[in-house]
Curated annotation (Swiss-Prot):
Annotated family: Belongs to the nodaviridae B2 protein family.
One annotated Gene Ontology cellular component of this protein: host cell mitochondrion
Superkingdom of the organism of origin: Viruses
Keywords: Host mitochondrion, Host-virus interaction, Inhibition of host innate immune response by virus, RNA-binding, Suppressor of RNA silencing, Viral immunoevasion
Name recorded for this polypeptide: Protein B2
Assembly: Homodimer. Interacts with RNA-directed RNA polymerase.
UniProt keyword Protein biosynthesis, yes or no: no
Organism: Flock house virus
Length: 106
């Protein structure tokens, strides 16, 4: 069975093949309303082909997506909850300096 990455990489070619097969259908002898509907289908297929190609290109430019598709654990770009809590605790436990204004008197 092909890898997830290989399946994604093959999508534009598979779509291209399917679109070419559909575009190869002859329908010039069809009634006008059918011909119009099939013309709309061709336009939709061409747009789908471009959309899939752009999306696959965009996905394969992202290292985290490629790592996932290859079965690797992607590196965490965001800090973990523990790191964020530790940072928050440190920011609240810093000693005050002499430049801080005195607390307000009530």
């Amino acid at each position: 069975m092909p890898s997830k990455l290989a399946l994604i990489q093959e999508l534009p070619d598979r779509i291209q093949t399917a679109v070419e097969a559909a575009m190869g259908m002859s329908y010039q002898d069809a009634p006008n309303n059918v011909r119009r509907d099939l013309d709309n289908l061709h336009a939709c297929l061409n747009k789908a082909k471009l959309t899939v190609s752009r999306m696959v290109t965009s996905l394969l430019e992202k290292p985290s997506v490629v790592a996932y598709l290859e079965g690797k654990a992607p590196e965490e770009a965001k800090p973990t909850l523990e790191e964020r809590l530790r940072k928050l605790e440190l920011s609240h436990s810093l000693p005050t300096t002499g430049s801080d204004p005195p607390p307000a008197k009530l």
